[in-house]
């Protein structure tokens, strides 16, 4: 039974992953473009925030983004293989030591900033 579910999940992932999904971790700043359906029709909305957590669970993989707008914290949980997602772009790579950044939920202002991770494997010439 579990093999059937595993095969089904793999097939659905292949069908839904027609776009490029970048590699990212918690602490990275992401820009997600998604379709929003409302009474006026369909529009494209961009959400940019820090990835608080990432959950790898096959077809049900998701990640949570957090941004601060007008001194209000906004969190958005997004499913990785959702058909409403147009694109995912990594803006900055963050340097953190945790997989789940729940301590960030109570931070505002300068204390909520994350240092940028510099990839030293690429040699600048």
From Swiss-Prot:
Superkingdom of origin: Bacteria
Keyword Ribonucleoprotein: yes
Any single GO BP term: translation
The entry's keywords: Ribonucleoprotein, Ribosomal protein
Gene3D superfamilies, alphabetized: 2.30.30.790
GO cellular component: cytosolic large ribosomal subunit
Pfam families associated with the record: Ribosomal_L19 (PF01245)
GO molecular function term, any single one: structural constituent of ribosome
Matching SUPFAM superfamilies: Translation proteins SH3-like domain (SSF50104)
Matches recorded under InterPro entries: Ribosomal_bL19, Ribosomal_bL19_sf, Translation_prot_SH3-like_sf
Family membership: Belongs to the bacterial ribosomal protein bL19 family.
Reported function: This protein is located at the 30S-50S ribosomal subunit interface and may play a role in the structure and function of the aminoacyl-tRNA binding site.
PANTHER family attached to this UniProt entry: LARGE RIBOSOMAL SUBUNIT PROTEIN BL19M, RIBOSOMAL PROTEIN L19
Protein name: Large ribosomal subunit protein bL19
């Amino acid at each position: 039974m579990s093999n059937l579910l595993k095969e089904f999940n793999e097939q659905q992932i292949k069908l839904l992953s027609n776009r490029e999904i970048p590699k990212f971790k918690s602490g990275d700043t992401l820009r997600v473009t998604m379709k929003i359906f409302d009474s006026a029709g369909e529009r494209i909305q961009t959400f940019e925030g820090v990835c608080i957590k990432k959950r790898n669970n096959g077809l049900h993989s998701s990640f949570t983004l957090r941004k601060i707008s007008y001194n209000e914290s906004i969190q958005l949980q997004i499913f990785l293989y959702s058909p409403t997602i147009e694109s995912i772009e990594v803006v900055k790579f963050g340097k953190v030591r945790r997989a789940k950044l729940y301590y960030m939920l109570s931070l505002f202002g300068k204390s909520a900033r994350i240092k940028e991770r510099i990839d030293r494997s690429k040699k600048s010439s």
